[in-house]
Amino acid sequence: MKVFGDGGLKGRTLSPIVAVTQIPLLQMQIAFAIGLLGVYIGWRGIIAKMTGFYDMAGAFKYLLFGIVSGMVFAVASDEMILQFAVLESRLNIIHAFIISLLIGASESALVMFLLGRPKVVTLRASTPYGWTLGLGMGAMFTSVLIVRLFDPLLGSDFSGFDIISILIGLSIAVIACLGNALISTYQGVGVLNSKRFKTFYTSTFSRGILILGLIATLWQPLLIIFFATLIFYYWPTAQQNGYPLV
């Protein structure tokens, strides 16, 4: 199915409330469970190997920060890009990308603020906290996307509740959680190395690509291969050094 048209993004006019209420409660719970599965993978892959070298309570607190703020940004991405641009075809790809950059800049600004707090910097905890913060943000973005994917009215060839959509959802969960975690930890490295503004611009662009790209995977799942390549390029570094991108 063609996602991007000449004048805008192709899709069906549909309000966010209608889209959500089309799927049963069980399917919505499954969608959020898949999103949280990405948190488990990221936690077991990195945080669980840092035992004794970081503040567990602080890491968990930043995970909650990520979940709460991530839902706000996920809803913004859903209504301003997926709903307004894709389903209602009111924006072209350039305008949609600009909006994704604005959302990405907002995310990066919040991450820079949270990881740059004096107490966090003093503890040298900006990197592990950034990892858990990103996991929470990615989980909520994933959950909203999967709720959309399970909706048969989405207009995608892969929408609806079946094994294919579940597999796509699982792939999105891994990419969104690990992708956001890598980007947030990269900002944490910038905070500790006094390069927070340089990493802010890079992370904003990266988040913009990730947001728009993962939305597009609802129609073009092969994009998962592109993002998976980037994620797993940095994954060995994260496993070897304990912190990603360090």
Write out the residue ranges for each language-model feature:
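Hydrophobic alpha-helical segments at protein termini of multi-pass membrane proteins
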Residues: 3, 8-246
